[in-house]
Amino acid sequence: MRVEETLPPLVDTPGDLAEALREGTLTNIPKSLHEHINTAYPAHVCLIGTALPDGCAQITPRGSTMVFDDEHFALWERGRGSTNANLADGTKVTVFFRKPPLRESGLLPRGGIARFYGTAKIYKSGPIYEEIWKRLIEPEKKGDPEKKGFGVLIKVERAEDLSGTPLAI
């Protein structure tokens, strides 16, 4: 059984998807980066950025960050700390990925860096919650053995390199 067959659509209505496509707001995570991001732990974990209530940036490494599909990152939030306190449906999130060998190989420019900007949606139960847990790497599962955390999907709205140029890979 494919995941797409069991999960609800990630947009509210087909009209929302058509509108998003017309407006050009959907941004894909380049397929050439999927495996690099999904195997980033432990050497090249993604940094996740959110804004604190005082406006300062909260940046934290998340070994649980993974590509969920072409348009979404997923991560497991263990339920403690200031990032957890600031994550809610609609929270703006930055995913910062850096792997210098990708610059050397020519896959990514400027330091092997890709930045993704999007919006979070929280899952505390249901099929997406379970799918995120299922895909989670074992070291992260060990950090939450009682499964008290929650899943987060981040819908990518923009992807760029270090200079702010849209990713073109």
Task: Mark where each language-model region is.
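Binding-site signature for planar aromatic cofactors or substrates
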Residues: 1-169
